[in-house]
Amino acid sequence: MLRLLEEKIATPLGPLWVICDEQFRLRAVEWEEYSERMVQLLDIHYRKEGYERISATNPGGLSDKLREYFAGNLSIIDTLPTATGGTPFQREVWKTLRTIPCGQVMHYGQLAEQLGRPGAARAVGAANGSNPISIVVPCHRVIGRNGTMTGYAGGVQRKEWLLRHEGYLLL
């Protein structure tokens, strides 16, 4: 059975769940008010093998590292280990999201092209929307083709804040 260590931390944008495995690889990072969605994703990815959630304090130092990100040490999120469920395509999208540098954005079509799947922007968008590791797998760095702040599971206001925090100038 998979044991997931969890802690809820305070951030400038509200409480954030940090969930990792016993090897301290992030499995989920989600805003508190979307915890039902997080549980649904955990069930989808790990119900078959079974999992239990265990309260922990700063598991593997991950909570402190996320606090550092919010305090301005932006590059720290690039160092955080992750382990995700999902389909092979979803994992490919999520891995590619981590290559978008802090302070930069990409639109869904560009991300699809980078994956070698031109024309798959909608599929990329769907995979982006089911990302269980918010912020660390930076789905907030993907915007609409015309520069619009398209959907972000944590809310568009958070997306805008995160992009400003990372130095992306919003017009």
Swiss-Prot record:
<dbReference type="GO" id="GO:0032259">
    <property type="term" value="P:methylation"/>
</dbReference>
<comment type="similarity">
    <text>Belongs to the MGMT family.</text>
</comment>
<keyword id="KW-0234">DNA repair</keyword>
<dbReference type="Pfam" id="PF01035">
    <property type="entry name" value="DNA_binding_1"/>
</dbReference>
<protein>
    <recommendedName>
        <fullName>Methylated-DNA--protein-cysteine methyltransferase</fullName>
        <ecNumber>2.1.1.63</ecNumber>
    </recommendedName>
</protein>
<dbReference type="InterPro" id="IPR008332">
    <property type="entry name" value="MethylG_MeTrfase_N"/>
</dbReference>
<keyword id="KW-0227">DNA damage</keyword>
<dbReference type="GO" id="GO:0005737">
    <property type="term" value="C:cytoplasm"/>
</dbReference>
<dbReference type="Pfam" id="PF02870">
    <property type="entry name" value="Methyltransf_1N"/>
</dbReference>
<dbReference type="InterPro" id="IPR036631">
    <property type="entry name" value="MGMT_N_sf"/>
</dbReference>
<dbReference type="InterPro" id="IPR023546">
    <property type="entry name" value="MGMT"/>
</dbReference>
<feature type="active site" description="Nucleophile; methyl group acceptor">
    <location>
        <position position="139"/>
    </location>
</feature>
<dbReference type="GO" id="GO:0003908">
    <property type="term" value="F:methylated-DNA-[protein]-cysteine S-methyltransferase activity"/>
</dbReference>
<dbReference type="GO" id="GO:0006307">
    <property type="term" value="P:DNA alkylation repair"/>
</dbReference>
<keyword id="KW-0489">Methyltransferase</keyword>
<keyword id="KW-0963">Cytoplasm</keyword>
<dbReference type="InterPro" id="IPR036217">
    <property type="entry name" value="MethylDNA_cys_MeTrfase_DNAb"/>
</dbReference>
<dbReference type="InterPro" id="IPR001497">
    <property type="entry name" value="MethylDNA_cys_MeTrfase_AS"/>
</dbReference>
<dbReference type="InterPro" id="IPR036388">
    <property type="entry name" value="WH-like_DNA-bd_sf"/>
</dbReference>
<dbReference type="InterPro" id="IPR014048">
    <property type="entry name" value="MethylDNA_cys_MeTrfase_DNA-bd"/>
</dbReference>
<comment type="function">
    <text>Involved in the cellular defense against the biological effects of O6-methylguanine (O6-MeG) and O4-methylthymine (O4-MeT) in DNA. Repairs the methylated nucleobase in DNA by stoichiometrically transferring the methyl group to a cysteine residue in the enzyme. This is a suicide reaction: the enzyme is irreversibly inactivated.</text>
</comment>
<keyword id="KW-0808">Transferase</keyword>
